[in-house]
Amino acid sequence: MIKRENDLQQCFFNDTLQTVDAAVFDAVSGELRRQCDEIELIASGNIVSRAVLEAQGSVLTNKYAEGYPGKRYYGGCHFVDRIEELAIERAKNLFGAAFANVQPNSGSQMNQAVFLALLQPGDTFMGLDLSSGGHLTHGSPVNMSGKWFNRIAYGLRQEDQLLDIESVERLAKEHKPKLIFAGGTAYSRIWDWKRFREISDEVGAYLVVDMAHIAGLVAGGVHPSPIPHAHIVTTTTHKSLRGPRGGMILTNDEVLAKKINSAVFPGLQGGPLMHVIAAKAVALGEALQPAFKDYAAKVVANAKILAENLQNNGFTIVSGGTDNHLLLVDLRNKSLTGKHAELALERASIICNKNNIPFDPQLPSITSGIRLGTPAATTRGFAENEFIQISDLISEVLDGLTIAKNDDENFLVEAAVKKKVKNITDNFPFYS
């Protein structure tokens, strides 16, 4: 009996996922094949290093560590304290911030922590409208931020689809918000952080910058940093920063840092995910290496190549181009919706997402555009030649869809492009 119990115990500790749960193993294996065989152009997507995967899949999953380094509510935390301190110091060094909280479990929770720290329910704040490239947590009516607080939306100029900074100033003076959110998820141009801070100071508002999408570009020195201008900066640790899925909050203000720490724990979260914090530490360490600057520069260069070649192929790019890692394609001149374009491209192994364009007449579930991004494909090693090919393959699929009477009629085009995609991806393996 004892031997049988010991055998069962050893099985628990040593049996692999494939042995224990074939259904989950098959799905994970399928996802790996999908990632290897398809071209990932979702702007918020990326591919982490094996070291990041190893840290996140480590024994730290077992460790509960409520509190902060040196001030835990559980014993046995000396190793996880060291890991969290590494993550904090690396975040501060990478972005030039005096304080960093690396515990938020997600981008939504990091922004919720800011609201909890700085606002009371019913307070007024400003954020970029979702249809102009903002985020749900910047005051969308369907999100907590839009339900609990009075959000005043700002947007883009219709004539050039650039940020309407004059409108931001006018609305701020009119509504006197306590907080102004800058940053977004689908704006392809450079943000003027200095001007936002000037407007915030004029009305006595906190300036909070959500740089989740561009954090890797800021770290790599190819996008201006908001740290010298914002009261608080929030960012995810995935996307262009190429780390695990999670959030982080930065500031140079000690008083605000204490408020943020209290808002994250115990305000919103209990025990932090130490395996994820370890993976954050690894990714931040990678971003501190000289090679990351080269990576960030390539991400932007590849986005510009993709935008330029799509324009040459007759596609309309919102605002005329891009300064960062993403671009929005307006499909109205092709008589296509974003929904149909996304599905057709996926059938051809090119992965993107439908996305509203500024002043979009279509519903968010349909959209008039698609959003494309270069971080993941650049991580794989794709360069100028590959992105020229990708732009041509996108054009083949979508021009075929324009001509076809229905999705089925574009099948041969999509199948041919799928083979061409496989020829490209076979030359750029990962996790081998």
From Swiss-Prot:
EC top class, as a word: transferase
Subunit structure: Homodimer.
InterPro entries on file: PyrdxlP-dep_Trfase, PyrdxlP-dep_Trfase_major, PyrdxlP-dep_Trfase_small, Ser_HO-MeTrfase, Ser_HO-MeTrfase-like, Ser_HO-MeTrfase_PLP_BS, SHMT-like_dom
Enzyme Commission code: 2.1.2.1
Recorded catalytic activity of this chain's protein: (6R)-5,10-methylene-5,6,7,8-tetrahydrofolate + glycine + H2O = (6S)-5,6,7,8-tetrahydrofolate + L-serine
Protein's cellular compartments: Cytoplasm
The gene coding this protein: glyA
Gene source species: Bartonella bacilliformis (strain ATCC 35685 / KC583 / Herrer 020/F12,63)
UniProt modified residues of type N6-(pyridoxal phosphate)lysine: K239
Purpose of the protein: Catalyzes the reversible interconversion of serine and glycine with tetrahydrofolate (THF) serving as the one-carbon carrier. This reaction serves as the major source of one-carbon groups required for the biosynthesis of purines, thymidylate, methionine, and other important biomolecules. Also exhibits THF-independent aldolase activity toward beta-hydroxyamino acids, producing glycine and aldehydes, via a retro-aldol mechanism.
Name the record gives this protein: Serine hydroxymethyltransferase
Superkingdom, natural source: Bacteria
Cofactor: pyridoxal 5'-phosphate
Pfam family, one: SHMT
Similarity comment text for this entry: Belongs to the SHMT family.
Keyword Lyase set for record: no
